[in-house]
Amino acid sequence: MKNIQDAYGQQLLAQYNRQTATAEIIERDDWFIDFGSDAGSYFTEYEQWSPLEQQTIKRARGRILDIGCGAGRHALYLQQKGFDVTGIDNSPGAIKVSKSRGLKKALVRPLSDIDKFKPNSFDTILMLGNNFGLFGDAENAGLILEKMSRITTTGAQIIAGTRNPYKTDDRDHLEYHQFNKKCGRMPGQIRMRIRFRKTVGEWFDYLFVSPEEMRDILTATDWQIEEFIEQPEEANYFTVISKKSEGNSTADEHR
């Protein structure tokens, strides 16, 4: 990714360098446009996180890979707790910020290249900040989950956050669900790009799923739901996904 296309990274750099950083603009492929997250939210400390997020991150253990680490808020918290943490992001700007903030291991690396890590490198994979969405679609999720299986230890876990797309009464979003179905996509699959000031990112897919859809995605993989961490009234939720034991793995049957 060229720096000029790294709208997300430019936003983080502006915030880190104390410039006036507004929220990024999210543009969807149905021409829906909205403000995304305020830049400051990517720099929040543990005390500012939601109770559910605080509860979830306590499940992290061992050697940790933080996927989509951004400005490093999760990775830095765990590093300060004494964990061996590696952060990756496909945004050069994000990695520059996370390194500047003190993250010792931070790499510009897309999710598709996680198999460049050696086998048995990690005990926990983090996909917080709704980053289960980085799978993009169900088919790609299966491919990436297989790579995750190879780079993690026996008994490893994925700790992820996402959003239930069906917990909305917004007409624009409900119409987009139907638009997606007509395009042969999952209702919560968003094709989007990010704008910040004069910088425009590339189009990419981001996936929101219900708990039931997440279970379906994991069915033919080496992974299974261990626990959902959620509140009934909230659309955002977290999950702990555990690696199946060798005798309980179903992925080999589908390769």
Model segments located where?
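Conserved SAM-binding strand-loop segment of SAM-dependent methyltransferases
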Residues: 102-114
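Short, low-complexity, charge-dense intrinsically disordered segments
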Residues: 252-255
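S-adenosyl-L-methionine
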Residues: 1-59
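SAM-dependent methyltransferase
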Residues: 2, 11-16, 153-213
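A short acidic, Gly/Pro-enriched loop at the edge of an enzyme's catalytic core
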Residues: 116-125
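Conserved class I S-adenosyl-L-methionine
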Residues: 61-70
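Conserved SAM/SAH-binding beta-strand->alpha-helix loop
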Residues: 91-92
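A short glycine-rich, Lys/Arg-flanked "PGG" loop and its adjoining helix->strand segment in the class I
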Residues: 141-154
